[in-house]
């Protein structure tokens, strides 16, 4: 008998509810085709939670997430809540506390150039023609963003500001394991990004990554300095499989990876803890300007579901089925408005219907 899974669904604001509805259609198709027992509960988060409960992350939402196997998150924020105090705004008051509460230390951001979308890639046509499929694995809770001491002191010409890059062995070991385990599900290559020619923290990073690599003899490991990595991503992104990055370097490279795909509407994201519990969300924002118009691209939300299936439910076949269905839709020229470039475009609902049907059919 198959295991029972429960997913906390947090649609949020803007286009969140529209694109989430499409992901849930696809989840229905996965249930049927793979005989998976998946239940869901829906909770308010972000601006809608402020309106309904007076707080961007209500206690009931947190408790519901605690009872779930994973969180499928939409998007939060919008002009309506921009004038609230920063800590009460949807983004800072909901997403960051969720990451902290569940100790989500790793961020996974896939960046893939899909066949038929090469024209959207800002790289040279001959580079785009080679395609790329990269997974950026970023450490989320350590490094210079959180290291102490940090601050400002002094005055006049002696005024100074300082931040501290700190990494502990356990922090590097656990993010490295995420990268190597991810590579085993892909093309078995990890490129670890550092600045070991200058920084002590990067020297330790490289030493520990080398140690972890010994337990993954089936995965190829390469090291690359951050400055070279930013150039190589432009020169030949097809050389990369999994990028393993510290918090700061991952912040930079994950956005560069996203930009060279040419479409934020295609990019999912996963944040995981040590137990495999994760929060899965589109990399883009709530897009309030197009909310309610049935024109948003739901693929990033649907791909977030695929990541959830792969990393939190260990349902790799189901995740692959979703990715194959999306590939088929795009290869057949099915496009939402952001990808149509003047050609006929389908609605948000229609794109969800097509992908769900292809998942059910087993393309």
From Swiss-Prot:
Report the SUPFAM superfamilies cross-referenced here.
Isocitrate/Isopropylmalate dehydrogenase-like
Where would you find this protein in the cell? Answer: Cytoplasm
Keyword list (alphabetical) reads: Amino-acid biosynthesis, Branched-chain amino acid biosynthesis, Cytoplasm, Leucine biosynthesis, Magnesium, Manganese, Metal-binding, NAD, Oxidoreductase
Q: Mention one GO molecular function.
A: 3-isopropylmalate dehydrogenase activity
Report the PROSITE patterns cross-referenced here: IDH_IMDH
Q: Catalyzes what?
A: (2R,3S)-3-isopropylmalate + NAD(+) = 4-methyl-2-oxopentanoate + CO2 + NADH
Q: Where is this site: Important for catalysis?
A: 145, 195
EC numbers on record: 1.1.1.85
Q: Which residues bind substrate?
A: 99, 109, 138, 227
Binding positions for NAD(+) per the UniProt entry: 78-91, 285-297
Q: What family does this belong to?
A: Belongs to the isocitrate and isopropylmalate dehydrogenases family. LeuB type 1 subfamily.
Listed under subunit, the entry gives: Homodimer.
Q: What is this protein called?
A: 3-isopropylmalate dehydrogenase
Q: Which organism is it from?
A: Salmonella paratyphi A (strain ATCC 9150 / SARB42)
Gene name for this UniProt entry:
leuB
């Amino acid at each position: 008998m198959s295991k029972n899974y429960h997913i906390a669904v947090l649609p949020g604001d803007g286009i969140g509810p529209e694109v989430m509805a499409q992901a849930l259609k696809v989840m229905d198709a996965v249930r049927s085709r793979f005989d998976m027992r998946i239940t869901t509960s829906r909770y308010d988060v972000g601006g809608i939670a402020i309106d309904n409960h007076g707080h961007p992350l209500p206690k009931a939402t947190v408790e519901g997430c605690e009872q779930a196997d994973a969180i499928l998150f939409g998007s939060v924020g919008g002009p309506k809540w921009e004038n609230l105090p920063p800590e009460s705004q949807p983004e800072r008051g909901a997403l960051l506390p969720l990451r902290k509460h569940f100790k989500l230390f790793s961020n996974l951001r896939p960046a893939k150039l899909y066949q038929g979308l090469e024209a959207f890639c800002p790289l040279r046509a001959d580079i785009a023609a080679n395609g790329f499929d990269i997974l950026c694995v970023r450490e989320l809770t350590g490094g210079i963003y959180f290291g102490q001491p940090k601050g400002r002191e002094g005055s006049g010409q002696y005024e100074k500001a300082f931040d501290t890059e700190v990494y502990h062995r356990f922090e590097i070991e656990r993010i490295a394991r995420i990268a190597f385990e991810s590579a085993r599900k892909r093309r078995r290559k990890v490129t670890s990004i550092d600045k070991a020619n200058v920084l002590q923290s990067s020297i330790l990073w490289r030493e520990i990554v080398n140690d972890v690599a010994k337990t993954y003899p089936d995965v190829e490991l390469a090291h690359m300095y951050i400055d070279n990595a930013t150039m190589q991503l432009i020169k030949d992104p097809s050389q990369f499989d999994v990028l393993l990055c510290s918090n700061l370097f991952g912040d930079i490279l994950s956005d560069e990876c996203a930009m060279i795909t040419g479409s934020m509407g295609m990019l999912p994201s996963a944040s995981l803890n040590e137990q495999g519990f994760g929060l899965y969300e589109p990399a883009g924002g709530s897009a309030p300007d197009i909310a309610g118009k049935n024109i948003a691209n739901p693929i990033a939300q649907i791909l977030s579901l695929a990541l959830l299936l792969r990393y939190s439910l260990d349902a790799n076949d189901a995740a692959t089925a979703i990715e194959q269905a999306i590939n088929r839709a795009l290869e057949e020229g099915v496009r939402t408005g952001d990808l149509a470039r003047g050609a006929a475009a389908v609605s948000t609902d229609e794109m969800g219907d097509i992908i769900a049907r292809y998942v059910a059919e087993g393309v």
